[in-house]
Amino acid sequence: MAGHSQFKNIMHRKGRQDAQRSKLFSKLAREITVAAKLGTPDPAMNPRLRAAVLAARAENMPKDNIERAIKKAIGGDSENYDEIRYEGYGPGGVAVIVEALTDNRNRAASDIRSFFTKSGGNLGETGSVSFMFDRTGIIEYDADKASADDMLDAAIEAGADDVVSSEAGHEIYASQETFRDVAKALEAKFGEARKAAVIWKPQNTVAVDDETGEKLFKLMDALNDHDDVQNVYANFEVSDALMAKMAG
């Protein structure tokens, strides 16, 4: 369970650390527009768009902003963004995956490479670390939506792979192939999830000391602060004391 908790806390630092709401909303809007462009502008029929809208709602992004981002795609937004995945190693040899949406591939690559180098790590080729992660669906519900037993029973019946329940809520994991069906089944029973997305989940995590952990968090913060970066994933664990310190 500790691994699940660490993974969740590390991945969620982005929201807590990003004090610049306008920058966060800009990133969320970019993902909504791209998702709507690539598929239908109806979230009910477009899983990626639905995930983007849920993420925006979770950050209290105004409804008007969400609708405007979707209309941008419908109206043939002139901005074109490339989806790029960067992979590399951070301090302590920790594997890191960076997902970006950029209108300037050269700038993004140069900036991200610089972040890795300054941290003492190095940016690798595509595929250099992704084999250590699984492409996994995650669905989250608030703790008061159901008891741990009820959520577990419903998730297993729907075809989920794993469920982790705590005071913070319920995390349901499903394969990329079954994710959409599991999400639909749970929504029919418990209502709309607070999050439903496909992520890179580490197969195993590496425990690092506090000094290395601080360097890794600094790298992740620098990456997350970049306008083009949408998501950052890594396969490390830190002490509870450091997690509390960095979250404070």
Swiss-Prot record:
Entry superkingdom: Bacteria
InterPro entries in UniProt: Integrase-like_N (IPR017856), TACO1_YebC-like_2nd/3rd_dom (IPR048300), TACO1_YebC_N (IPR049083), Transcrip_reg_TACO1-like (IPR002876), Transcrip_reg_TACO1-like_dom3 (IPR026564), YebC-like (IPR029072)
Biological processes annotated in GO: regulation of DNA-templated transcription
Transmembrane segments: none
Pfam families named in the record: TACO1_YebC_N, Transcrip_reg
Keyword Cytoplasm in record: yes
Signal sequence coordinates: none
Coarse class of the protein's main subcellular location: cytoplasm
Cell compartment(s), UniProt: Cytoplasm
Region Disordered: start-end pairs: 1-21
Keywords: Cytoplasm, DNA-binding, Transcription, Transcription regulation
Molecular function (Gene Ontology), one example: DNA binding
Gene Ontology CC entries for this record: cytosol
Family according to the record: Belongs to the TACO1 family.
HAMAP family: Transcrip_reg_TACO1
Name this polypeptide is given: Probable transcriptional regulatory protein Rpal_1287
